[in-house]
């Protein structure tokens, strides 16, 4: 099943949680923080401006994005996978290789 977000919403798959620190200490599930990065799965058509025109989004499918620690409170389960639904304004930037 696929989801097509509306307007300026973006569907993101959160990156995997880190289970160990850089020093090799294994973290229990409750101690590990959820990552604030993810891969864009799907994007809406764009933000509707006051004059009725549509402004395209600045992110594309496949982009790796950084979002706020408390962003992504809206989640949806698709085929057993938890996906985040974010507004474009929740995204801080796009990581480039």
Swiss-Prot record:
Pfam families, per database record: Cpn10
Subcellular location: Cytoplasm
A GO CC annotation given for this chain: cytoplasm
Keywords attached to this entry: Chaperone, Cytoplasm
GO molecular-function terms, A-Z: ATP binding; metal ion binding; protein folding chaperone; protein-folding chaperone binding; unfolded protein binding
Principal localisation: cytoplasm
GO BP annotations, alphabetical order: chaperone cofactor-dependent protein refolding
Function text: Together with the chaperonin GroEL, plays an essential role in assisting protein folding. The GroEL-GroES system forms a nano-cage that allows encapsulation of the non-native substrate proteins and provides a physical environment optimized to promote and accelerate protein folding. GroES binds to the apical surface of the GroEL ring, thereby capping the opening of the GroEL channel.
Similarity annotation: Belongs to the GroES chaperonin family.
Assembly, per entry: Heptamer of 7 subunits arranged in a ring. Interacts with the chaperonin GroEL.
Annotated protein name in UniProt: Co-chaperonin GroES
Gene that encodes it: groES
């Amino acid at each position: 099943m696929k989801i097509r977000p509306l307007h300026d919403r973006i569907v993101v798959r959160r990156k995997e949680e880190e289970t160990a620190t850089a020093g090799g200490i294994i973290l229990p599930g409750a101690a590990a923080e959820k990552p604030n990065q993810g891969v864009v799965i799907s994007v809406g058509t764009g933000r509707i401006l006051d004059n009725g025109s549509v402004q395209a989004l600045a992110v594309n499918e496949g982009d790796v994005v950084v979002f706020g620690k408390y962003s992504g409170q809206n989640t949806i389960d698709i085929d057993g996978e938890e996906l985040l639904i974010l507004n474009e304004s929740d995204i801080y930037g796009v990581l480039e290789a």
